[in-house]
């Protein structure tokens, strides 16, 4: 089983996160940020992983530190669980419609960190959640997993729908990339290492 558990404690947050890439059971997610709980639940469902997150943060300031630190911890867990990345597809992509919105994700588990985030999130807040934190979250995930991650909203009107389409597309693309392919011997790179 490809699993990982990490604890990250700073002066601003305390994060406990575990992931199982090979078995999907009910995930338990409690971040103190309701909208993020919703998005992580969708991500876990569509990536077909088990994700458990317990976070306490300085949300009396805002959700920035909590969201970013969860992204960091998720990225570190993904990196550890994937280990040497033997026989995985490596690449994944997905288009996901959410009512009037269409989200797209393409990713490469290359060992090289990069984020392209192309999403016009016209509503700056959803409840008390700052929508600019979506990019911060994915930046933290991409750089700590060491993945090349491209996310784009092709069109849409409702900011919630746009973000939901991105999280679902990310989950589905990640599932494709982490799937073990018996036709791939070793790692999926001419370099022999990812």
Swiss-Prot record:
Its EC number is 4.2.1.19. The keyword Lyase applies. Its main location: cytoplasm. NCBIfam families: PRK00951.1-2, PRK00951.2-1, PRK00951.2-4. Keywords: Amino-acid biosynthesis, Cytoplasm, Histidine biosynthesis, Lyase. One of its GO terms (molecular function) is imidazoleglycerol-phosphate dehydratase activity. The gene is hisB. CDD domains: IGPD. The keyword Kinase does not apply. It is found in: Cytoplasm. Pfam families: IGPD. This is Imidazoleglycerol-phosphate dehydratase. Pathway: Amino-acid biosynthesis; L-histidine biosynthesis; L-histidine from 5-phospho-alpha-D-ribose 1-diphosphate: step 6/9. Belongs to the imidazoleglycerol-phosphate dehydratase family.
């Amino acid at each position: 089983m490809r699993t990982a558990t990490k604890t990250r404690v700073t002066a601003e947050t305390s994060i406990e996160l575990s992931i199982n890439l090979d078995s999907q059971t009910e995930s338990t997610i409690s971040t103190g940020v309701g909208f993020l709980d919703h998005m992580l639940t969708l991500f876990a469902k569509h990536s077909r992983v088990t994700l458990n997150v317990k976070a306490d943060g300085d949300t009396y300031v805002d959700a920035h530190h909590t969201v970013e630190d969860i992204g960091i911890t998720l990225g570190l867990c993904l990196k550890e669980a994937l280990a040497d990345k033997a026989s995985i597809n490596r690449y994944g992509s997905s288009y996901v419609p959410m009512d009037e919105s269409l989200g797209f994700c393409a990713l490469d588990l290359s060992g090289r960190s990069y984020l392209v985030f192309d999403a016009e999130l016209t509503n700056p807040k959803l409840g008390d959640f700052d929508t600019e934190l979506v990019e911060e979250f994915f930046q933290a995930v991409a750089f700590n997993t060491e993945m090349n991650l491209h996310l784009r909203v092709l069109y849409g009107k409702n900011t919630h729908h746009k973000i939901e389409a991105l999280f679902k597309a990310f989950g589905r693309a990640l599932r494709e990339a982490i799937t073990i392919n018996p036709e791939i011997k070793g790692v999926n790179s001419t370099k022999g290492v990812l």
